[in-house]
Amino acid sequence: MMTTIPNLPDELESEILSRVPAKSLAKWKTICKRWYALFRDPRFVKKNLCKSAREVMLLMNDRVHSISVNRHGIDDRFEPSMEFSGKLRSLIDSKDVKVSKEANLARSLNTMYAKLKSNRISKLCGGVMNHFNIR
C-alpha cells in the first residue's frame, strides 16, 4: 500500500521551494509543468534570490575570486556596486561559472550576472537575472 501526501497549497509550496538553492531548483525544473512554470516566474526568482546566500565574483590583481556572503537580516535598501578596470588575462576554472562563446563571464547560479566585455553588473535583489535560465 502506497501512502500519498496531500497536495500543499500553492503558496506554501512556493515558499518552501523559494528557500531551496538555485542549483537544486535548476535540476528539478523538469519534475512537473507546475514547477517549471514557477521557476520561470520573475516574482519567484526574485524571492529565491532574496532568500539565498550570496556568492560574488571578485576581480582582483587579474584573478577572479568567488566570495560567499550571507546577507540574511542585512538591510537591502542600498545596492552595492563594484567597478572593474583593466584587462582580464586569465580565468580560474570553476564548476559554477560558465564562459560563453562571446567570452562573457556568465551566470553562476547563486551569484551574479556580469558581462566582462562591458564591465556592467546586472543585479536583481543582489543576485542574478535569468537565475534559472542558463544560456
From Swiss-Prot:
It holds the Pfam family F-box-like. Residues 2-48 form the F-box domain. CDD domains: F-box_AtFBW1-like. SUPFAM superfamilies: F-box domain (SSF81383). InterPro entries: F-box-like_dom_sf, F-box_dom, SCF_F-box_component. This is Putative F-box protein At3g17270.
